[in-house]
Amino acid sequence: DEIQKDDEGNWLHVIPRERMKVKSEKIPFDRKTPLSPQAVELLENTPRIGFHGSHLIFPNINKGKRSAFTRDAVRALIKRMHDKQRKIDGIGWVDPDQKDRTGKPRIVTLHGCARATFNTWAKDARGYGHKAFPRDLRESCLDHRNESYQCAYDREQALGDMREVFDAWGEFCFSEIK
């Protein structure tokens, strides 16, 4: 993953396609996500902790390791918070719409929470007070693609439109902080 500027000086988070879940040859371009001014400010002001020469924003410095913060660390944190909440309310942090193999509600995941929160916000223009964003643009922001037709015609992402969505999302996410 890499943070870089485009030709107009706008910041992007770029993930090479080969590192993405969808690695189809029908999607020839890397995943680019425009960064909102709030995201850029957060990244610029986040102290770099770790080891000399580290380029990692959130390094794993546990037990002397010098690597990136992992999904497993986040999963373990969510599991601990779930267990603590479950002792309080008997339920914990579960998604009632998602079931495990035994039919019980699954513990929430960072991936699911983040995507569901973004998609709910992006769909509800009236409720959240932003411009309405078309479904295909919301899906593009989530990197959801229907290979059978979309990939045949989409040669690149609509970064200008996506930037508008992510700028509004940044405003919403930071609206209670400033």
Region locations from a protein language model:
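Conserved tyrosine-mediated DNA breakage-rejoining catalytic core shared by Y-recombinases
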Residues: D1-N45
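Active-site-proximal structural scaffolding
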Residues: D6-E8, P28, K32-S36, G112-A116, ...
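Glycine-rich, flexible loop segments associated with nucleotide phosphate handling
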Residues: G9-P16, K26-K32, D100-H111, K131-S140
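Active-site/catalytic core of tyrosine-dependent DNA strand-transfer enzymes
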Residues: P34-V108, G112-R126
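Non-transmembrane alpha-helical segments in soluble domains
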Residues: R75-I78, K123, E139, F166, ...
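C-terminal catalytic core of tyrosine-transesterase DNA break-rejoin enzymes
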Residues: C113-S148
